[in-house]
Amino acid sequence: MNKLHGMPCPNVINLSECEDRKRYMASKFAEYGVSPVFYSYSRFEDSDNEIVGDESAIALTSKGCFSSHLLTIRDWLLNTEDELGIFFEDDVDFETVKYWNFNFDEFIASISDDWDAFQLCGIYETYPLMIPRARKFWDHGIQCYILKRSYAQRLVDFYFKDVGSKVMHYSMPQDLPPSVENNILNGFGPTLTFPLFNHNINDFKSENINPCIDNYNQQTGPSIFSYRLIEAWWRITGSKLTLQDIIEGKGK
């Protein structure tokens, strides 16, 4: 079974200096016969992109992450006619895929149609409810998600005032804690979440989280905890569940 059968062409967001991550993502997709499109970006401070708006709010966001996701989504809208777009950062872990007892196409078809965006990878500070469900603003992680075309258009219209501009107008679409997840995955239509994939903390030489360190900082602690949690759930529980079991929450 090709587990990624039916997946739309992946749009992979990559920091241009991190060639190892690009090679990793290309090799993983190649294992499943999938050819992604890569979007490689310089660091925000080295680019000609611009974010305008409330300076105090902008200071709280990751400008490179925010801008690269929006530019990628806009490019997908302008250059495809696909009804579904799937977006990856370059640090997605694919080990969960071997535990799926279904393929990607079957998973999407099993979900009722009342969603416009779907978060497919998360970083969790506590044990999440392991069932496809409505995303909450504390569901962190922007590593992988699907957008319907209509949702993506509303999002792009909100942040870009001119079609070809590299100027993004920063504002939270709802009164929520500022984060790129909430910029992208809140406020433009119903959003679901379920961790089909995991956050990769292991496989890179470029700057990333080291799972072996003893002194966890504010970022590494939740990321390592979450990685181990999701990996264990898929290996121990998810691998024994049918797709219908997952949809019905029998492994939650």
Mark where each language-model region is:
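An acidic/histidine-cluster motif and surrounding catalytic segment
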Residues: 1-88, 92-252
